[in-house]
Amino acid sequence: MQQYLKILTDVILLGEPRNDRTGTGTVSIFDSYAKFDLREGFPAVTTKRLAWKSVVGELLWFLSGSTNLHDLRVFTFGRDEGQWTIWTPNYEDQAISMGYDKGNLGPVYGKQWRNFGGRDQILELIEGLKNNPHGRRHLVSAWNVAELDKMALPPCHYGFQCYVSNDGYLDLKWTQRSVDCFLGLPFNIASYALLTHILAKLTGLKPRYLIFSGGDTHIYNDHMEQVEEQVKRKPRPLPTLVMPEFVDLYDLLENNTAAWSFHLEGYDPHPALKAKMSS
């Protein structure tokens, strides 16, 4: 995960102070890039502990098409008992003031992935990868301009594209307009790595490269102390992803609906580093 630490270092050394929507303030650069070879291990950050269960739960929630906080809790914890999730601040700080209730967040990621203007982008992507692997339209977008003002949070990672090599490997590249380097980016890396593995399994391909392209890449001012500690730590060996058996998207979502169905074997990170999420 040296690629991730390099991004942190670039922001520290090259970033400029910026005001932001949350009022916290950031140090920011524009444009960031990283490439991970998934054959070398699963890119879970090791210089602090990754909230793995939350990564899995959120991705399954996206893939299900749900935009409700209650469903996110079920995917993450196996039950809804009002647990805190990474979407809880967005619900409490934005969604409620927009008039939403009962856990609704508006037409966020899941809605766009599974019903963008009536199109199920995920099913179309899977079919395209199977039937037209060399196609150049293997792309999913969450940036629905007509519905941005209805979302509790417009998408930070707003699109991804897939590529199939001649020898049966699957690559995935995602694009992100706003990159919270300390809390968000490790989560996003793991999420899209998991998505690449899931898509590869559903299409009979082998996961290969995961590529990240970021826009406004920033460290919040109140995260800087933790980041400076993190970049001093030496990365440890990457874990191996162990997934449950599933034959299609329905099987994945209906029979493996809890995050504990997915494991990181050999994951031995440095201790957790805590910080407040700006919403």
From Swiss-Prot:
Residues given in the record as dUMP binding sites: 21, 136-137, 177-180, 188, 218-220
Active site: 156 (nucleophile)
Binding residues annotated for (6R)-5,10-methylene-5,6,7,8-tetrahydrofolate, in chain numbering: 180
Record Gene3D superfamilies: Thymidylate synthase/dCMP hydroxymethylase domain
Example GO BP: dTMP biosynthetic process
Induction: Expressed in the early phase of the viral replicative cycle.
Pfam families, per database record: Thymidylat_synt
Enzyme Commission number: 2.1.1.45
Domain of life: Viruses
Enzyme class, broadest EC rank: transferase
UniProt catalytic activity: dUMP + (6R)-5,10-methylene-5,6,7,8-tetrahydrofolate = 7,8-dihydrofolate + dTMP
Keywords recorded for this protein, A-Z: DNA replication, Early protein, Methyltransferase, Transferase, Viral DNA replication
GO molecular-function term, one example from the UniProt record: thymidylate synthase activity
Function recorded in the entry: Sythesizes the thymine necessary for the viral DNA replication.
PANTHER family noted in UniProt: THYMIDYLATE SYNTHASE, THYMIDYLATE SYNTHASE 1
Family, as annotated: Belongs to the thymidylate synthase family.
Full protein name: Probable thymidylate synthase
